[in-house]
Amino acid sequence: ACVAEALQVESKGRELVKQLEQRMEGITDRACAARERPRVACLEWLEPLMAAGNWVPELVQRAGGANLLGEAGEHSEPITWESLLESDPEILVLMPCGLDMKRTREEMYWLTDRAQWKTLKAVQNGRVYLTDGNHYFNRPGPRLVESLEILGEIIHPDLFAPSFKERAWQEAG
């Protein structure tokens, strides 16, 4: 809205903000109708491990998940392997700061080379996902609406068509 005001297109800016808010509300409403809220951990860095903070915990909650690590409105924090193992997420979303999916896949050895990796419920159930953190999760802005859509697709694939799959997220496999 501030940019629109500076460019003297305030009404267009207000309309765009309204459209983005409506998209977010629609996603949240659909996700909240889900019977289950899977336990989700989002990692913003792989070595050392860092739990995603800032806006990501709120996005997880709005997408119908129960955020396990990181606090909404707080900076991303380093975590221990023990805390990741104790939280034992049903879904693990990798969104390293500044990395695209190709680079994230290359860096996964920081996780997969550890013996404990295979003990995680998300790993055992094939619910580990790579995202393009650089484009969708690591910066605030209007694109966070798409970030919410991506998390909806990952957390509740039965409720959301995979329109961002392969382009913005993929199964770690």
Residue ranges of each PLM-predicted region?
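N-terminal ligand-binding lobe of clamshell/alpha-beta domains
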Residues: A1-G173
